[in-house]
Amino acid sequence: MIIKEQIMIKKYILLMLLVLFAGNLNAQAKTYKMVFVPASEKGDESDYTSLIAITEKLTGLNIDTIKVTDYNAAVEAMRAGRAHLAWYGGKTYVKAAEIANAEAFAAGVRPGEKDAGYYTYFVVKKNSKLKKFNDVKGKVLSLNTIGSTSGDLIPQVELNKINLSIKNKEHFKKVYYAGSHDACLL
């Protein structure tokens, strides 16, 4: 059951920003490296196949992918010059802009929506007694990964609005980082 407090962040640091390393993308280079953190349990570039195909078509660039295991590694690949492009969430983009000279040039917009943004859901088991957002105090909480905008930062912001913090041991019985959005549901 999805608790009804569905959160939409519009025009905030945009959903999964596609960023361009502020280097020279000139005609001499044949292939550009795109770094990504797997978006699903499958964990391969098929998560980004459509994005890569569209980017290649619109820009004329050839793109190879570099898979990394976490957001910090994606930023570091850009900072070190091993990647030219990345698909980041808002929190990671801010870090990449600061230390890797990343520059946003596009944002993902879901089909049927006018603005870039994303949703964060708090999910409980079907027969759970948790019916309101405030009911989560003292329970076990599973988040995505440290550094995830939709799976870590925004849930913490929303919890703080009701005076709960994952850092306060009295607020949650246990807080887990599951490693992916899918794994949070297990």
Explain the meaning of each model-derived region:
Residues 12-21:
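Sec-dependent N-terminal signal peptides
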